[in-house]
Amino acid sequence: MTELVGRTRARCVETLSLDSTGTRNALSAALVAELSAALAECGKDPDVRAVVLTHTGTTFCAGADLRDPPDPDALVALLRQLIELPRPVVARVTGHVRAGGLGLLAACDLAAASATASFAFTEVRIGVAPAVISLPLLPRTDPRALARYYLTGERFDPAEAVRLGLLTVTADDVDEALAPVLDGLRRSAPQALAETKRLLTARVLETFDRDAASLTALSARLFSTDQAREGMTAFLERRDAAWVV
């Protein structure tokens, strides 16, 4: 079986690379399961100080795989796992991020992107809503500023992603920008990192506890509607949906 998540390690930093370029690293049931297993191993390994989540190809993550979507509960569990992992997780993005991929980005503790990256909440254009991914997104961003992109599905650039709170930093050379961040994590005590992360994620986890069930139900309901079926069919057929005027 082809591995969908690559793994390398350098000086106690484990790099997990989404590696399903044929689907633009879309969140399939298999990819979600493999990433979850890799994260679980990182969380148990005392030699892992931090995790970098990155990708191969030109897309960090295209969102849910419409041909092999993950169970909504599995996606919620993956996002929560990123947040609860007792190691800082740093997103490294050098390509496009769409829909559910932005949920992964928001679940990471820090996020850096190259100047060529682009972002879009495309759910509304296929007849659904960014429901489950709102669990990590809304507590960590400015909802008023986010409203434009949630409601329109427009693309936006890394500078705007920084302004919204989706990114920590953007730079022409993302690895150069991340070098001092990773150096700082390597210099920090593991126990202190874990407890400091707990402080930073407490409000996000409160949102999961309160809203996960209702947002999962909303996602399931919307994906079963006629508009969602039309939207997904139009997307796969590369045409405008019937409601476009």
Identify what each model region corresponds to.
Residues L82-I126, P158:
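Glycine-rich beta-to-alpha active-site loop
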Residues S134-R144:
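Hydrophobic, secondary-structure "cap" segments at the distal end of domains
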Residues A112-A117, L167-A213, D226, A242-V245:
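C-terminal long alpha-helix characteristic of the crotonase
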